[in-house]
UniProtKB/Swiss-Prot annotation:
This is Translocon-associated protein subunit alpha. Its main location: endoplasmic reticulum. Keywords: Calcium, Endoplasmic reticulum, Glycoprotein, Membrane, Phosphoprotein, Signal, Transmembrane, Transmembrane helix. Residues 229-286 are cytoplasmic. Belongs to the TRAP-alpha family. Residues 244-266 have a biased composition (Polar residues). Residues 46-83, 236-286 are annotated as: Disordered. The chain crosses the membrane at residues 208-228.
Amino acid sequence: MRLLPRLLLLFLLAFPAAVLLRGGPGGSLALAQDPTEDEEIVEDSIIEDEDDEAEVEEDEPTDLAEDKEEEDVSSEPEASPSADTTILFVKGEDFPANNIVKFLVGFTNKGTEDFIVESLDASFRYPQDYQFYIQNFTALPLNTVVPPQRQATFEYSFIPAEPMGGRPFGLVINLNYKDLNGNVFQDAVFNQTVTVIEREDGLDGETIFMYMFLAGLGLLVVVGLHQLLESRKRKRPIQKVEMGTSSQNDVDMSWIPQETLNQINKASPRRQPRKRAQKRSVGSDE
């Protein structure tokens, strides 16, 4: 009987605890925690909104900077409609590295006011982005006044750097001038992609070997022709010319021994028939 109240007390203590752990109908603690979670969610959303506003504020300066850059680009001086320009490369549109490139720029004033041509400049740009400079050449100061309906010609020359040989670059040639009112103009006389040619200095090994090979081949041809002509001369037979024996002087006596010739010369010649007949006639008269 004493254990029964104790067991009942333990049951009363354990049952509510089990119900609370399982989330039963007496779950007031879980309901009490919901407001805190809602507060955390609200705080997170507020923080996210603040981050979005900060990102928007950060993006606005970049947009303003881009707008300023576009305004700067658009504010660059342009060519005047009252002027016309032409360009002529003296040696053609070939750009050898480490060699002088010369061209002439013609300026025509088609307006009614004077133009003051200030300078002429040239530069190599990156082919994919002409805003990126590779090599900037020295500007040529001109300060020349061109009256209305008149023309002027200007000469400019530059030397491409030797390491640029064999690569394409954007060549930009600008003519800067202004009118009497102070309005500044800039005309892109030439704005195209060109290729710098590698300069060939002297003779390379392949060229020298080719010349030596051709010289040796020519010498062999000459020697072969000479040997061919000599062999034909040797094979050609000697034509024997038959000489008559009409006179004694035409006979070749060199093959006869000298002793035999001496004996022939000592022998008395034969008498001719006429001399014998004359002697007989003289004897008959006697």
